[in-house]
């Protein structure tokens, strides 16, 4: 095995280490929730934690004080409305009409807890994460409305495709407000509509604000790995996708205007996002940080619509859309341009999207994500076969040149310049590119990285089974069988590869599979499955190239001879 293959494996190993670091950074071990003790309210109702006030630009000091007090308050269950569809379980507080809880019944927290759905929004103080909306007055101050509804429970029944939850109330300035949430079957997008009726004798001015309020979630450090990204993001026609980490929001608030766009809070596999109702209007996007002394800070991100002017006796309407659910590109792309970029495929996003499209097309046929990974990997290796074959043959040519290079070393001794000139002349004469063995393989590295992100970021692979003992491709193999098979596949690859006369290089190449096996123990099973398939196909390709190398070389010589005759 020549030194170039060792260099190539070292490069791949370093990439794997970087990817593993990224995995630990983005998805550290899930911290245990802090237990909370609920205190009974004065009226005996069972309380639910919640933060009512809304925060909009222009009232920094007031909102800081109000927010600090509100985060420790409770709201009785008597104020809650429950809404259940086939994909969402939602709680709405009639004070303000905000969504204070959202669960996803089709996404259990784990295979061991199938009856416990993933909860995106929560009103608990230690994990505060709510979707707020309301009206501001002419001075930009939010107004809190106590709403009423016809029912306390709304359920999307069989045969229904739409569920409407209508709230009515009167603002402190006498305005009659109707707030309507519309839910649809198999849809995580919630349509919000505000209707304002000015029954007063004075004109009214105000705007719609929508925002997401979230306490920074707890994180854990894993050895030397830095913590994950779990924060805000936004998009606009100018910048389709922009991450807004908690650290950046601490340093500077968002304060910008844009037509259309969106604002969101992300986490692994899921997100919540507000999308303006009219893409032709200009909205003001903002953020606000509420410091906390004993707990993580609370972050507010949102937007305000253009001001509405409602004459006395007149009406006006405005609307927006809230998405609370999984990061599925097809769903997100239909809501707002760039929202699908919240599926964090990294800087190779276009390649990752293409690979996911292929993976999905294969899955539509085989109905198993594990087999889809295997088949997609085989297709990738077929597409890149020309590069692999060129690399294998180039390395074979370099090995053939080793005796002649050794002779040059003996002839020129310590004269490095003369040795370099003689070596390059030999390469030129024999038409050998010294980098020909590495470059074709390196071209494939971006595809490996892109496919890595597809496997770890696509919610479709979350809790997706393969065969036998693999019940979840997004987590490590519980019995470490796949990493062992991966190590054996690397040993098979070494077996079909021509060996180097250097005993040190031979030992290095046989040690690498052991190192990689240990290294891949904690990787997601889907990623290890991809690596196994890649190794097996590459081993077969190298075996075929080795078998046909002499005939290929003879054809090449004959072709060159014909060219010289011309």
Swiss-Prot record:
InterPro entries: Membr_insert_YidC, Membr_insert_YidC_N, YidC/ALB3/OXA1/COX18, YidC/Oxa/ALB_C, YidC_ALB_C, YidC_periplasmic_sf. Pfam families: 60KD_IMP (PF02096), YidC_periplas (PF14849). One of its GO terms (molecular function) is membrane insertase activity. It is a multi-pass membrane protein. One of its GO terms (biological process) is protein transport. Required for the insertion and/or proper folding and/or complex formation of integral membrane proteins into the membrane. Involved in integration of membrane proteins that insert both dependently and independently of the Sec translocase complex, as well as at least some lipoproteins. Aids folding of multispanning membrane proteins. PANTHER family: CYTOCHROME C OXIDASE ASSEMBLY PROTEIN COX18, MITOCHONDRIAL, OXA1. This is Membrane protein insertase YidC.
């Amino acid at each position: 095995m020549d030194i170039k293959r060792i260099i190539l494996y070292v490069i791949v190993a370093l990439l794997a280490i970087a990817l593993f670091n990224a995995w630990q950074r983005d998805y550290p071990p899930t911290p245990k929730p802090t237990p909370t003790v609920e205190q009974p309210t004065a009226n005996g109702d069972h309380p639910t934690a919640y933060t009512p006030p809304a925060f909009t630009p222009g009232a920094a000091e007031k909102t800081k004080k109000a927010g600090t007090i509100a985060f420790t308050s409770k709201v009785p269950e008597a104020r809650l409305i429950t809404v259940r569809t086939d994909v969402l379980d939602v709680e709405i507080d009639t004070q303000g009409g905000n969504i204070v809880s959202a669960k996803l019944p089709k996404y259990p927290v784990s295979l061991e807890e199938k009856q416990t759905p993933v909860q995106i929004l929560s009103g608990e103080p230690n994990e505060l994460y709510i979707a707020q909306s309301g009206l501001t007055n002419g001075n930009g101050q939010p107004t809190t409305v106590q709403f009423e509804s016809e029912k306390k429970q709304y359920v999307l029944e069989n045969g229904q495709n739409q569920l409407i939850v209508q709230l009515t109330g009167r603002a402190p300035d006498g305005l009659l407000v109707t707030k309507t949430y519309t839910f649809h079957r198999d849809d995580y997008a919630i349509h919000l509509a505000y209707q304002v009726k000015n029954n007063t004798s004075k004109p009214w001015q105000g705007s719609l604000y929508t925002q997401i309020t979230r306490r920074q979630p707890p994180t854990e450090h894993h050895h030397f790995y830095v913590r994950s990204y779990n924060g805000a993001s936004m998009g606009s026609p100018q910048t389709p996708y922009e991450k807004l980490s908690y650290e950046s929001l601490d340093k500077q608030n968002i304060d910008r205007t844009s037509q259309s766009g969106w604002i969101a809070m992300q986490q692994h596999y899921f997100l919540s996002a507000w999308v303006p109702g009219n893409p032709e209007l200009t909205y003001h996007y903002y953020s606000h940080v509420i410091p906390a002394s004993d707990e993580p800070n609370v972050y507010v991100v949102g937007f305000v619509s253009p001001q509405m002017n409602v004459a006395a006796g007149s009406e006006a309407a405005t609307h927006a859309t809230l998405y609370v659910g999984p990061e599925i590109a097809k769903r997100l792309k239909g809501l707002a341009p760039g929202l699908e970029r919240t599926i964090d495929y990294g800087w190779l996003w276009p390649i990752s999207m293409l690979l996911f499209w292929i993976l999905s097309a294969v899955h539509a046929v085989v109905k198993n994500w594990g087999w889809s990974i295997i088949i997609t990997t085989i297709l990738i290796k077929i597409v890149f076969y020309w590069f692999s074959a060129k690399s294998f043959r180039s390395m074979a040519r370099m090995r053939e040149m080793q005796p002649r290079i050794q002779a040059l070393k003996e002839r020129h001794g310590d004269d490095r310049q003369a040795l370099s000139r003689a070596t390059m002349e030999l390469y030129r004469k024999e038409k050998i590119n010294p980098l020909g063995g590495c470059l074709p393989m390196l071209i494939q590295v971006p595809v490996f990285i892109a496919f890595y992100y597809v496997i770890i970021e696509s919610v479709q692979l979350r809790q997706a089974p393969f065969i036998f003992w693999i019940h979840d491709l997004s987590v490590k193999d519980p019995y470490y069988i796949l990493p062992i098979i991966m190590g054996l596949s690397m040993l098979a690859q070494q077996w079909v590869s021509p060996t180097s006369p250097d005993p040190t290089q031979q030992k290095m190449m046989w040690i690498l599979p052991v190192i990689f096996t240990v290294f891949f123990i904690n990787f997601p099973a889907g990623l290890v499955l991809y690596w196994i398939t890649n190794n097996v196909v590459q081993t077969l390709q190298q075996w075929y190239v080795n078998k046909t190398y002499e005939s290929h070389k003879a054809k090449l010589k004959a072709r060159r001879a014909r060219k010289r005759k011309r």
